[in-house]
Amino acid sequence: SPDSRYFAMTVSDDRAVKELWVINSMAHPRPTLETYKYQMPGEKEAPIEHLYLFDLVDNKRKEIKVAAYKDQSIGLEYKPMMQKQRDMEDQPSIWLGDNNRFYLSRKSRDLHRIDICSYTVGQDSIVPVIKERMNTYQETRPLHLLSNGKELIQWSERDGWAHLYLYDDKGNLKNRITKGPWHVEEILKVDNKARVIYFTANGMNPNENPYYEHL
């Protein structure tokens, strides 16, 4: 958390997952056998992910209820790193939100269902804020906050292209920010005061290599 009282952590329970073996041919003087947990397609044994909140003042740990989909995955959202922090050896890891609330994503294994969720300290479970549903694989990008957390900028492929959408903190869509037959790649900076977003995009010019990025 920004005030360092709490920290959230995801834990993957792989005990039921079967092992996979590979040969490390670069080992010296002879190749070695490497073993790790890996779920093959069609296998029922899958990692189970848990979310914990730790209180460093009260010295307590709490597991937060996150279950929704079979073989789901969860991922915490983090505050964007400042430019001066990019070259630091020990980079800060601060959750996206305020001292008592943070955001995370919850995804089904086939990535057809993605929930942007929030958690407020004191609750027992997370709360879905934005729900994405598609019959194809979806990608995601980091969430961004505006107006002291009262607004959210979400990257979504819902119309077949990657674009930005503005929501309030209750999950109500206010408006779409970008539109067109091109792809928003990454948000670089958000000017909260001027309400301006600096981002990179691909495919802006149909006669140009689509891998060329524009700012």
Annotate the PLM regions.
Residues 1-3, 84-98, 142-148, 189-192:
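Structural signature of eukaryotic scaffold interfaces centered on beta-propeller domains
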Residues 1-79, 213:
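Predominantly five- to eight-bladed beta-propeller fold
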Residues 8-14, 42-45, 93-98, 103-110, ...:
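Beta-strand C-termini and the immediately following turn/loop, strongest in propeller blades
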Residues 47, 89-91, 112, 139-141, ...:
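Beta-rich catalytic cores
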Residues 49-57, 117-124, 166-170, 213-215:
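Beta-propeller blade signature
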Residues 62, 79-83, 127-133, 173-178:
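A short beta-strand motif characteristic of beta-propeller blades
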Residues 68-71, 132-138, 180-185:
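Short coil/turn segments at the loop-to-beta-strand junctions that recur within blades
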Residues 162-163, 173:
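Glycine-enriched catalytic-core subsegment of oxygenase/oxidase enzymes
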